[in-house]
Swiss-Prot record:
This protein binds specifically to 23S rRNA; its binding is stimulated by other ribosomal proteins, e.g. L4, L17, and L20. It is important during the early stages of 50S assembly. It makes multiple contacts with different domains of the 23S rRNA in the assembled 50S subunit and ribosome. The globular domain of the protein is located near the polypeptide exit tunnel on the outside of the subunit, while an extended beta-hairpin is found that lines the wall of the exit tunnel in the center of the 70S ribosome. Part of the 50S ribosomal subunit. The keyword Lipoprotein does not apply. One of its GO terms (molecular function) is rRNA binding. Coiled coil: none annotated. This is Large ribosomal subunit protein uL22. Keywords: Ribonucleoprotein, Ribosomal protein, RNA-binding, rRNA-binding.
Amino acid sequence: MEAKAVGKHLRISARKARLVADEVRGYDYKEAIDILRFTNKAASSMIINLLNSAVANAIQMNESLDPNSLFVKKIYVDDGPIMKRFRPRARGRASRIRKRLSHITVVVSEIEKKVS
């Protein structure tokens, strides 16, 4: 069983968010939260919220599910729209500032137990 959480229009560049997302891909839920909690990046708090939301969605689908039996199956960061702002420069000119947004998707799944 899979559960998904999507964060859209998050105010961080996709390039910076991918650095953090790549750190937790494949880890189980508890370990991923521990890694993110000690990662000193702005994207880590956003990904923690999305990971908690994905786990809550999984529990919503199956009440008897243990959160510790979930792992991060997929996590990916896509580019969002770009907010364009202008900064005044010398001689009456202006420079464009591009504030980048991103969409982050987290998919959690149950750890499959091996039957022997």
